[in-house]
């Protein structure tokens, strides 16, 4: 079913903006946009085009990369020094927090997030001439809300990374000054509060037609994140423009309320099987609220950076050892790169918590139903022959948790990521699993944290007694919580949402990102690393309109 929506989104060939410039256009042929929009049946497809830029966000050169590699949940060691994953120290800079404004990933996050927001604004402008007919059909608020909420998500990714960003709500080529972080937060929150009501509540009947698109559940989940993290974004009761917020506690109370709207919708539930959220066919998950729809077998689109930035999901290719191609019949040989730091793995209850590593003695014979791989890579499921890396000195492929060095690791160092089901029949070149952006488990854990911070003991007790809340742990083999403090909640969120784009902001909220220390990353002298630098090229081409974030040397 999910492929239907990919085809709908691919009507971008009829009405499109290019990613290469903020307002540059490529004309692919007829019909024109006006002709398309004259047919009300096509409006939903035209609005669906606005999701085209979302697929660029989960690449390791993009938003997913800068958020994941910069935390304690991921490391990219140089293997076979000077050859594998060196890239002149590029990945090391994210692991040890020594990045600069020249790093190309920042430029690409800036480009694609802005391009997505501009595309939303363009389509909004194209709906205005047919506003009356859409209103008559009862569709205007629905479609404009979808575009505005999706625009919020694009700007949220930009804001979450850089803080001070230009924020446009109309389709214009005019450059605008950067807004301060609290101003951006206010705009996002105000828009989401106003528009969420017009989006569909997901039901069994409308799930398919709204899959991968903005819904009320998606909007309120994003809103809850913004309220929960308000302080970490520099928002205070004094600069907050939202009526009724007079103390920091009010931010948490609003977060609790937004989460409750998602809960009360009855649209979502905690799946019995944790891994069903990440299956190749995960479109039927009742837990996933917002996903990036994937098609692992379609054409490769990329940008010319080292390794080529892609709009295809390659999360297992990034991590698995080379020999998995032989063992599991993957189309391409995996890249033997990204892995888990050993200290991060220690947060799991080994042999109990299935979100953790498999039995290191079983390897590929016993890794099904575990999120991290350790042990030998066998020739096949029924063979006891351990594969060797023939072009790497015939070293047997036996994955170990220890990483010997960030700059001189072995090819076997570091647990490999298995949360997303691997295609073992060679059906697709890229991952066909839809990439999860928002999950219901996050809603429940956010509500608990916000209630705890607000001093709402009754809500915390209510959640601890909730079967869905406790199932998050019991389904993976862990004991339910009888009590839960913030330190344990941070650890639990790390276990539950590994590599799901939440860890960096979690650490910032707990003041443990810049000021924390872990494998290869020392404690910083100040918190300026909580924000990434504005790309140097962006500043240089702004005509003096935009300035660098504090703490970064613009000459580097």
Which residues are covered by each model-predicted region?
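Bacterial Sec-dependent N-terminal signal peptides
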Residues: 1-29
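Long, intrinsically disordered, low-complexity segments
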Residues: 19-20, 113-116, 187-189, 210, ...
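An aromatic- and glycine-enriched ligand-binding surface/loop that stacks and positions planar moieties
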Residues: 20-91, 193-194, 198, 213-395
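Conserved, well-structured interaction surfaces
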Residues: 39-48, 52-58, 62, 82-162, ...
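C-terminal substrate/ligand-recognition segments
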Residues: 103, 107, 354-468
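Short coil/turn linking the two alpha-helices of tandem helical-hairpin repeats
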Residues: 157-161, 166, 203, 229-238, ...
